[in-house]
Every structure is written in C-alpha cells, then in structure tokens.
Amino acid sequence: MYSIPDSLKSDIGAFAKHVHDFRNGEIEAVKFKAIRVPMGIYEQRKNGTFMVRVRCAAGMITPTQLKEVALLARREGTEPIHITTRQELQLHNVQLEQAPGILEQLYHLGLSSRGGGGNTVRNIMASEDAGISPVEVFDVTPYTLALTNTLIAEPDSWSLPRKYKIALAGNDSDNANATFSDLGLIATIRSGEKGFKVFIGGGLGSKPTAGFKLSDFIPATDLLYVGEAVKILFSEHGNRRNRHKARIRYIFYKLGEERVFELFHEIFNRLKAEGNYELVLPEVSQALNKGQLIDFNPENELPGKWLKRYAKAQKQTGFYSVEVPFNQGMAKAETLIKLAEFLAPLGEDVIRFTMRQNILLRNIPGQLLNSLYQELKDLGVEVDLPRILNSLVSCAGADTCRLGICLARGASSAIKDSLSGISEDQLDELSDIRVNLSGCPNSCGQHNLSNLGFYGKASRNDRLYPAYYVVAGGRTGDNKARLASKFGEISAHDLPQFTAQLLGKWSVKKERFSDFNEYLDREGQTDIEELIANYESIPSFETDKNYYFDWGAQDIFSLAGKGAGECSAGMFDMIDFDRDAILDIQKGIEHSSDQELINKSLYGIVFHASRMLLVTRGIEPSNREEVFTSFIQSFILEGHVRQEFEPVVKLALENSEASFIEFRALIDELGKTVIGLYNNMDDSLQFKTTPDIPKVIGIVAGAAPDKRFKDFRGVACPMNFVKTKIELASMKSGELLEILLDDGAPIKNVPGSVRNEGHHILEEKQNENFWSVLIRKQ
C-alpha cells in the first residue's frame, strides 16, 4: 500500500476548521470549494450533499481496509459504495458535517482522499493484473506505489494548473490506459535492464489525444525523476489562466512536441544532477499458500461456466484471479464486509479495483474456487450471468454529477436488459467487447476508449429529449492507440435496442474478423450508420412521451439541476466570483436613482476589485481590512494598478459607510481596470503590463546581493510554498531570500520544492520550533 504523508493529519485538522468556519458563515462558498475539492470532496447534484473519493494506488486495498471502509459507509449512511473507472472508491450522500470525521477514520486505515479532486496529482493507476499476468514484462505495482509515495508527499502536487493523471501498464497491450494519460509508462526491458516506454500529454476530456511518445526506454531507476520532471513542466508551462486549456496536452498544442520534449529534458537533467530522488520500491507481500490447478471445463455447467467467464490462471502455478462483478460499480457495504472476511486469511494482496468498475481478486488457490463461487452466490453477486452483462461501464451521469446531461446508469441498465434477450452462447462470444457510457462529453465513463461507446447530449424535437452520440473503435497500446470515432446520435429511448442489434450483427460476423476493431474498419462502420439512420425519426411528445423521459427518470427530461463541475475548483473560482460580482453590481445600478443603494454598491465594487486578484499573489485575507491593505501593498504600490485609485481604496478601508457616490466614475474605472488586468494575465499568473513604479537597479557585479526576508510561520502547506514561489518570481537572478518555516511538514517539503524549481538552498538552520531557510534565486 502507499504511505500516508506526514502532513495529512494536520491537513485534515485544518479542513475540519474550515468546515466549521464555512458553516458559521466565516468563509464564502467559492473559497470553501477551493479548499474542499482538493481534499477529494465533491458536491453532488443535490445541494448540500457530497461525495468522498478514496485514493487506492494501483487499485490496491487490503481486506482489512475494505472491510473497515464498508463498516464506515454503513455507520455513516453513505451506501452504496462506488468503484470508479480510475480504480478508486467513492462514498456518496455524505453530509458536510460528516466529512472531517470520515477523513479522520480513513487516515487511521492508511487511506487518504487528498488529491481526489482539484488541480492535483490524482490516483495513479496500474494494470489490474500487475504481478500475476503470464504475459507482463514485469510487475509495475511497486513502481506505482513508489511514485505515489513521492508525489503525494510534496506540497506542489496540490497546486498544479489542472489535474495530473498517471498510469503504468505491464506490457504493450496497455490495459491501464497509459497511452491516454498525462504521464503513461509501459514496462519494457532492454539488455536485461527494466525500464519504461514514456508517453506524455494523453487525455480523454476536451480535445482528447493519445500521449506523445517521449522515449522507448528510460531506466526504471529514473522513474521518480520522470514523474517529477513532468510535474514541474506542467506547473511552469501549464495554462493557469484558462481551465479549459489547462491539461498537459495543451502545452503540446501550444508549443509543439519538439519544444515540450526539450523543456522536459532540461528539467529532467537538472533534477538528475541534484540527485534527490532515489527509487525505493515498497515490498508487495503476496503471502501465497500452496495452490492447486483445477479443470476449467467440468462439463459445461456452473460453476464451470463461471470459471470460464470470470477466472484466469495466474503465472503463479495453482493460483487464479477472479473478476467479481458489481453492477455499475455499486456495492452494498454488507457484500464488501463479507467478501473481505472471506479473503482475509489469503493475505493482503488479494484485491484490485478494475477500470470496468469491478473487483479483481488475485492469489486465490485453485482448491478454494468452488468455495468462492458459493460465497459470491450467497452474497447476491451476479455470478451466473455472461460477462458482457456484468462489464458495462457508466459514469454517475445526471444521477449525482453536476455536469451530467443524461442518466447514464439508467441507460446502462436498459442496455443490459436489452442484451439479455440474446442467447447465452452469443453473449459469451461478446465477453471481450467494451461498452462504455458517459452522461456528458467529459469521458468519465471512458467512452473514447471503448469498442462501442456513448456520451450524453440534449437534443430537441418539439421539446428537449435525452440522446447520445455514438462512438466506436477506441483502443489502447503502444503504436496502436486510437480514440473512438463519432458516427452520429441516437435517442436515449432507442439506445438499448440499437446496441443489441449492432452487437447481434457482430456476433454473427465475428468469425470473419480478428477482433471488433477489424470488423469496424471493414464493415462495422456501415452497419452503425445504417442502424442510426433507422432511428432518426423521433415522434412528437403527443405521439410517444417515452422519448422525452430519460431511463429511470420520473420527470420529463430537462437540464434542471445541471451546474458547473468542480474538478478544477480553486483559484479561478474565487477570481470569477469577484469578477462576476463587480459586473453584476455595475449592471444593477446602471439605471438606478436610489442613492443609498448606489453608495452601498460602489463600496461593493471597491471590495470585490481589491480582493479579486489577491489569490494570484498567494494572499488569503481573513477580513475586509486585510483585503484593502493587501491590495494597496501588492497591486497599487507594486504598480500593477494606478496610484490614483489608492485614496478610494483607503476610504473603503477606513469606513464602509462613507460617501462613495462622488467617486463613482473612478470606482467604475477601478473595477474595469482590475478585470482588464485579469484578462491580460498570462498562463503563469504574470500581468502583461508595465508596472507604474521605478525599475529596480540590478545587482552590481562583485557586490553582495540584497537579502529579502519573509516570515511564513503559521502558513500551512502548500500555501507556504506558493508564497515563496511568488516572492522568488519578483526577484532577480542571484538575489537572496530568507524565509522562516514551521517545523514538521513545512521544513520537510518547501526546501525540496524550491530546489525542484531550480533555485539553490544555501542554508537550513533550526531555531527552537521553527527554521530559517536561505535561498539564492537561480
């Protein structure tokens, strides 16, 4: 398992205080969201209801941990437990006051939700059969854990331009989606040395693409340097200005493959020269007992069919892996508790979560398979169904997600029912087909990588109705990665029948093709287009109301309840809140003659304009006085905003009820100026303006450089590093900065992060319960 960072306990304590302050009205909702989401806590579609995402590196969890998480979910009333397409667990229907306690309990289990959301290093995925596959190059599990341990312990992993997704695969077939990750690593061996093929910049959201191949081989011992170098590259060159263009792939779109790789190698070589990242592989304990080979064909009856559908022989003789299906990844707590109790005697490495939202058991002795079958059957697991019926993937969709357009889970259930009309023999022929659904274009259901996929949209006839785009032909793997192609759209109502008809055609033609993708390339595209054409006509609401209800919905389809997603919650949410407030206030008083309202509104413009961009300087004001004084210090005196605005800001500081009407034109101009400054801010949060202050004289050759001083005691990670980084950004090469840091996580994390930026740590000196760190800017 991965190691919990030293800072997590204090992070949870700080989060509990933030929850208290938010509930008491001391923190605005937009600022609290920026705190909450990086802790892995998302608001669901129903206001005031939340989801907690639990990190499970490589999809690993021990039987003890699984049982305790299930008991926790049962105690807290957060069932069912959701297995995600990124090999994690999610606890749904959490009330905000429950969240700190849940995080504390997860901490004591050796589990963390930190980085489950926001602009952070997300859960690192790995091949579900890592360590047991007869065809893997080598086991990538310990490498996944080592990379996780390093990255989640560093404060700059929580303040990236956007999410950073990593995956490791055991061979070129890439069953971990490494070729479509921000950083993808595929195991390989060269001249007897273990290593990885490296891909950078893959992704499935907006403007999806396969990763750009950096190298056919980097030594496995360089793994941490690669992970760190990509993170620093992302942090320095990622677009912090526009969240819709903030993933690593957009750096490639902007700078080109050659330049991005040059930047990577510059950072990588610098890190290697410093030599701070020694690879230490955690031991993964398999604790195998003696296994026994079994016959997979004891006639053709259950559990023989179950074995053929769900069990595979491992490379360890006498041991087997078994896929345990959970419909749409939803599991009852009682089921997981009993399953964990059954598995506990078999050791700690017996469970992996899969990207098809199921559990893959491993290291199961052959002699226990019949007992396992009976246990699963007693628990109500659908062990007797053909595999394709238990491997349909869907995201949460509009059931709980704020971005969801369609009820993807309902559509998935309807497809399952429709496919059930096909004979079992035909369904068994479809066992390897990947059918994936997403409730919107964001690809949380991984439709872009499916053999046959769908993603939700709102279409209109005489009124709105739920529909899906049809995509097909996605594949992963070195030299063959390909996104699914879009063919057209179909109503949600017709989707199940369409799916059954298409897969029925494939099952009849299957013997003529090597796989489904060859069928698509030669005949399948025509079949899809013809079937879509058959369903083009949508009856009016009066003729057939069923088309205007989504699967599982009680109400007529609409976009009510759809809202902004929270994945990128952070700095720009707070900025946008103040910007929108300025614009709304200006519009609200444009034609008003109410002098009292106008005066109060003008003060509001000064307040929001003063606060709007403070976060870009690492400033988090706790009261109105700090808002105004910080704005004067960091924007007016620094020359980013004209000095003529200073008197009106000071007036607001001194008296919120003063007369502002006589300064109306100036205040309107202040609002426009700050918004204009924001609009001209570059990707790295620097302002494209000439500061209205005298230039600082550079360092004279041979002269002792000036030393700046900043006291960051009491400032928690990662804000202490953010403040240090901002201070260094305003300095010249060779200048010195002395900072004071608290003992514990700050001194452990900040100096290392500063080194990663290329600066030099000249001295670290302890003074009782704090440290002095002297930095020379590169």
Q: What is the predicted role of each segment?
A:
Residues 595-614:
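Short, hydrophobic, well-ordered secondary-structure elements
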Residues 570-588, 610-696:
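Long, charged low-complexity segments
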Residues 719-725, 729, 743-759:
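Amphipathic alpha-helical interaction surfaces in cytosolic regulatory modules
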Residues 697-731:
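An N-terminal amphipathic alpha-helical segment
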Residues 1-588:
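Peripheral terminal and linker regions in Fe-S/redox and tRNA-modifying enzymes
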Residues 766:
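Long, contiguous binding/interaction regions
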Residues 772-778:
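Core SAM-dependent methyltransferase catalytic element
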